[in-house]
Amino acid sequence: MTSCSSFSGGKACRPADDSALTPLVADKAAAHPCYSRNGHHRFARMHLPVAPACNLQCNYCNRKFDCSNESRPGVSSTLLTPEQAVVKVRQVAQAIPQLSVVGIAGPGDPLANIARTFRTLELIREQLPDLKLCLST
């Protein structure tokens, strides 16, 4: 059984009973702001718009949507190259020491943009090895 809680831009779901998780997974979830019950108050996260392509073309998905009041994974005003993305991450990490997770969630499907996605993750891993990497497809 899972429990979902609403947040700006969607829902976060996790097992209703954390004892169902292995100790390794429970430790990782506790330090990840998307899955930890209290983590989103202590850790900062950043999503990088490096993946424009999507092979699904779902009717409900409008990846061209761009609104200054809309801030969630998959909505972006600009597209970054992998090199631009790692520069941006370094700038944010310097300004916000709580940054602990960097994710790629669009604006398309990261796995439909495998070269850009993996190059971005590779550069971040090389230059900022303490950050957790997240991929949402």
From Swiss-Prot:
Source organism superkingdom: Bacteria
Cofactor binding note of this UniProt entry: Binds 3 [4Fe-4S] clusters per monomer. One cluster is coordinated with 3 cysteines and an exchangeable S-adenosyl-L-methionine. The two others probably act as substrate.
Necessary cofactors: [4Fe-4S] cluster
EC numbers for this chain: 4.-.-.-
GO biological process, one term: nitrogen fixation
Residues that bind [4Fe-4S] cluster: C54, C58, C61
SUPFAM superfamilies: Radical SAM enzymes
InterPro entries hit by this protein: Aldolase_TIM, MoaA_NifB_PqqE_Fe-S-bd_CS, rSAM
Residue ranges of domain Radical SAM core in the record: 40-137
Entry keyword annotation includes Iron: yes
GO molecular function, one term: 4 iron, 4 sulfur cluster binding
Residue numbers binding S-adenosyl-L-methionine: Y60, G108
Keyword tags: 4Fe-4S, Iron, Iron-sulfur, Lyase, Metal-binding, Nitrogen fixation, S-adenosyl-L-methionine
Iron-sulfur recorded as keyword: yes
Pathway(s) served: Cofactor biosynthesis; Fe-Mo cofactor biosynthesis
Top EC class, one word: lyase
Protein family membership: Belongs to the radical SAM superfamily. NifB family.
UniProt protein name: FeMo cofactor biosynthesis protein NifB
Organism annotation: Klebsiella oxytoca
